[in-house]
Curated annotation (Swiss-Prot):
Membrane topology type: Multi-pass membrane protein
Keywords: Acetylation, Cell membrane, Cytoplasm, Cytoskeleton, Endoplasmic reticulum, Membrane, Transmembrane, Transmembrane helix
Region Targeting to endoplasmic reticulum membrane, residue ranges: 136-188
Organism whose genome encodes this protein: Gallus gallus
Subcellular locations according to the entry: Endoplasmic reticulum membrane; Cell membrane; Cytoplasm; Cytoplasm, Cytoskeleton
Record-annotated membrane-spanning stretches: 36-56, 57-77, 94-114, 115-135
Protein name as it appears in the record: PRA1 family protein 3
Main location: endoplasmic reticulum
InterPro entries (alphabetical): Prenylated_rab_accept_PRA1
Biological process annotations from GO: cellular response to oxidative stress; glutathione metabolic process; intrinsic apoptotic signaling pathway in response to oxidative stress; L-glutamate import across plasma membrane; L-glutamate transmembrane transport; learning or memory; negative regulation of L-glutamate import across plasma membrane; negative regulation of mitochondrial membrane potential
Amino acid sequence: MEVQVAPLRSWEDFFPGSDRFGRPDFKDISKWNNRVVNNLLYYQTNYLMVAAAVVAIVGFLSPLNMLIGGTVVILVFLGFVWVSHNKDILRRMKKQYPTTFVIVIMLSSYFLISYLGDVMVFMFGITLPLLLMFIHASLRLRNIKNKLENKKEEIGLKKTPMGIILDALEQQEDNINKLASYIPKVKE
């Protein structure tokens, strides 16, 4: 299947009035996780633009440090993904504790970059866009169009770059399994 880039959502859709934002239910982690994953899929191009703007600003201010910091984070992330696919314990940790997995990647990157003296570039250049994405994805309530687009991605009618990343982090398999177990129930 061909990978499709998700369309850039309008500013009114991406950042509407305060009535389309709501505090997540911290007691129901799976519901909160579902909101974050679905918003990451739906607004992925907008998030890419925000990240590119922040990275460009920081990169302009400190290009060498930004390059070193970005390289280290990518290498650490690829290393963890490779190790987790080859080691059962890490794979289970990634599946059961995805937030912990990402925090371990960030902390590992922090320590590697601190040896190079580029901690501030890492913190502002790479972590700030991730934090902004997470905050928006956590607070933004979904709409009908969002839910429809996410269903297309879940059942495999389309594939997007964020969908590939979430698959690598094993965040979409549960949704597909839920859908697969729901279809026979509907037929009955």
